[in-house]
């Protein structure tokens, strides 16, 4: 979203004339979005602990925040790609909502994966939100399964790296096109 405002009001043109690469600008935007997400997640986690939600291992807060940052880097890559390519804010928000809601609803955030129909759990297996939700839930409950955690982290690393590369490419290619 910030990229759209930067393009509209001319700040992006100033940033593009600086001696840093366009990829660095995209990475900076992604990291800024990820830090905001980490701050929001820490607030939610803090409120949850304050109202009595228990975690068997408080030292898991650090790894949980790392997972949140890893996932948000990937999802912010989608946001940066769309913001660089979108011609209007309406287009950007329409596509973000079109992608975001199904990703959320097709994850086990609201309904357990084990109780989903086979066709739906097959779709959820390709959803990075699924791996984030499962891993954070396991970490908060204290019952982390080794292979499940390794698979989740692997999927999130691949997702984040892929979105980092794609966002850098799309941002470099599209950001200075007319708005």
Locations of the language-model features?
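Membrane-interfacial helix-loop-helix junctions in multi-pass membrane proteins
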Residues: 104-162
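Alpha-helical transmembrane-bundle signature of multi-pass membrane transport and export proteins
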Residues: 20-21, 172
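Alpha-helical transmembrane segments and their short interhelical loops
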Residues: 22-97, 144-168
């Amino acid at each position: 979203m910030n990229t759209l405002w930067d393009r509209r009001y001319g700040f992006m043109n100033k940033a593009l004339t600086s001696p840093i690469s366009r990829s660095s600008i995209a990475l900076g935007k992604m990291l800024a979005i990820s830090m905001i997400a980490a701050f929001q997640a820490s607030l939610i986690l803090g409120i949850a602990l304050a109202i009595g939600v228990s975690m068997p291992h408080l030292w898991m807060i650090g790894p949980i925040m790392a997972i949140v940052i890893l996932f948000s880097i990937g999802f912010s890559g989608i946001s940066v790609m769309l913001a660089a390519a979108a011609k209007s804010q309406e287009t950007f928000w329409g596509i973000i909502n079109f992608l975001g809601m199904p990703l959320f609803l097709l994850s086990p955030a609201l309904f357990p994966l084990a109780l989903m129909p086979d066709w739906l759990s097959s779709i959820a297996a390709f959803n990075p939100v699924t791996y984030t939700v499962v891993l954070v839930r396991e970490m908060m409950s204290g019952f982390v399964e080794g292979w499940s955690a390794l698979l989740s982290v692997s999927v999130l690393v691949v997702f984040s790296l892929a979105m980092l590369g794609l966002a850098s490419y799309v941002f470099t290619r599209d950001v200075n096109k007319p708005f």
